[in-house]
Amino acid sequence: CDGWHLLKSDTLSVIQERMPPHTSEQLHFHQKTQQVFYILLGTATFLIDGETQLVKANESISIPKQVPHQIRNEQEEDLCFLVISEPKSHSDRINL
């Protein structure tokens, strides 16, 4: 993924990301951070606490803290999205 910080503070982070086709991030969770993903372009496949959900452009999904999750781009086009983290997720990521 390529990512650009739009806002970065101790209490809130907003990052715009681009995920190439047929890529994914590692399954993980955050101890203290809740997140909202807002899809700008494409369709994201999320694995959230063992359940798969599709999220399309102009839709969002909320991930509570301590819930295992993964985002995948199973499409033929780039996936672009915003990830909003409260508080910031830096150093609060546990890979599974």
What are these regions (language model features)?
Residues 18-20, 29-46, 84:
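Short, conserved beta-strand element in jelly-roll/cupin
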Residues 66-67, 86:
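Short, surface-exposed secondary-structure boundary micro-motifs
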Residues 43-45, 52, 68, 78:
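Structural motif
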Residues 11-13, 17, 72-96:
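Double-stranded beta-helix
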Residues 1-27:
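A short glycine-rich, His/Asp/Glu-containing loop-to-beta-strand
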Residues 50-65:
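Short acidic-glycine-tyrosine-enriched beta hairpin
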Residues 27, 46-47, 63, 69-75:
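Short beta-strand His + acidic residue motifs that chelate non-heme Fe in jelly-roll/DSBH
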